[in-house]
């Protein structure tokens, strides 16, 4: 059997560091093939794990730490020495690409320690590969691995209990983890959400055009706190969210946001909202919601300083801004990113 870790014959010189970026939700056999190929061209491979510190969803079912562990296990299983593998965890920044690029660069530089002998590993296959052009300082080494396999296909089989199909698509170490996770309470929650979302999308599949849903949300701040609600239904059960929802047929966006703020939090109607409107913005990242194409218009209401108003709804709470910004994994969809946007504006 050919040694998949030996340098490629007649190839370019071996780089000190390689960088391979992905979400790996979960890592599959094509990911492993790319990594093994890369390790024939570089001394050490820095694996950048995206969508870190996000809430578990059917699209992002595993934590960055879990993905790191199973990647390390599958590479060790393939005969790769652990010191040759380095990891970086990077959050999603749906509305600030510069922050994402900066976090990738900082994470990589923490390992390279000033070395410029860095190559970026990847395959430009569609619009999702745009990031490969975003690091001009790193030589681009295209992978020769060609595969139709995707993590989406693996997840679909996993949440539809086709575990035999899953075993054919992932390395043994990954399959062992998935079988164990399949018995965990987290899997049951994710499976319930997967089934809910599938039925939700099925309900409008016969529409003449794919629907675009319109929602309005309120970011309400007061004395260093932000008003949040804890979702009690699917999708996103027990996740923190801004109060908000679908726009009614006979109301403006602002009216919808104010109605949802009061209705979901129990904020006293004597507290004005419209006069405390500080800013507003449309958030339309195409994949921001697993329910389907959803565009939201968010309004920032700044209630100034003073005692925190009483909230009569049991699922509503005031959270210190520092705590909210430090815990993106607690939030539903892109709500953390939306709140972060308004807070960064000052």
What are these regions (language model features)?
Residues 198-242, 269, 303:
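N-terminal strand-loop-strand
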Residues 258, 266-307:
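Active-site segment of metal-dependent pyrophosphate-handling enzymes
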Residues 243, 257, 261:
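Hydrophobic alpha-helical positions that pack around
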Residues 240-251:
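Short histidine-centered catalytic/ligand-binding loop motif
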Residues 122-126, 231-232, 297:
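Short, well-ordered beta-to-alpha junction loops that form the rim of enzyme active sites
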Residues 139-141, 280-281, 296-300, 307-345:
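NUDIX/MutT-family hydrolases
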Residues 1-203:
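Nucleotidyltransferase catalytic core that binds NTPs
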């Amino acid at each position: 059997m050919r040694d998949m870790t030996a340098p490629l014959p007649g190839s370019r010189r071996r780089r000190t560091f390689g960088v391979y970026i992905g979400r790996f939700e979960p890592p599959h056999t094509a990911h492993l093939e790319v990594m093994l190929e890369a390790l024939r061209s570089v001394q050490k491979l820095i694996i950048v794990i995206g969508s870190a510190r996000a809430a578990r969803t059917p699209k992002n079912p595993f934590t960055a730490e879990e993905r790191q562990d199973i990647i390390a296990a599958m590479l060790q299983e393939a005969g790769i020495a652990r010191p040759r593998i380095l990891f970086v965890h990077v959050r999603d920044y749906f509305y600030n690409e510069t922050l994402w690029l900066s976090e990738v660069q900082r994470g990589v530089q923490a390992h390279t320690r000033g070395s410029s002998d860095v190559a970026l590993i990847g395959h430009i296959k569609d619009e999702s590969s745009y990031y490969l052009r975003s690091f001009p300082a790193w030589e681009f080494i295209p992978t020769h691995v060609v595969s139709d396999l995707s993590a989406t296909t693996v997840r679909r089989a996993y949440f539809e209990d086709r575990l035999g199909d899953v075993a054919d698509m992932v390395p043994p170490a990954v399959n062992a983890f998935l079988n164990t996770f399949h018995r965990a309470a987290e899997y049951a929650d994710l499976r319930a959400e997967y089934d809910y979302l599938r039925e939700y999308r099925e309900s409008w599949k016969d529409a003449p055009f794919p629907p675009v849903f319109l929602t309005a949300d309120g970011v309400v701040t007061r004395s260093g706190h932000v008003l949040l609600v804890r979702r009690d239904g699917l999708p996103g059960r027990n996740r923190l969210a801004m109060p908000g929802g679908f726009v009614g047929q006979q109301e403006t966006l602002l009216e919808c946001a104010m109605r949802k703020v009061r209705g979901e939090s129990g904020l006293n109607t004597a507290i004005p909202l419209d006069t405390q409107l500080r800013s507003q913005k449309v958030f339309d990242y195409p994949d921001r919601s697993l329910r389907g194409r959803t565009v939201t218009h968010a309004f920032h209401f700044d209630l100034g300083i003073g005692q925190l108003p009483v909230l009569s709804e049991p699922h509503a709470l005031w959270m210190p801004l520092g705590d909210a910004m430090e815990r993106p994994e607690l939030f539903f969809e892109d709500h953390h990113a939306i709140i972060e946007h308004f807070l960064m504006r000052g």
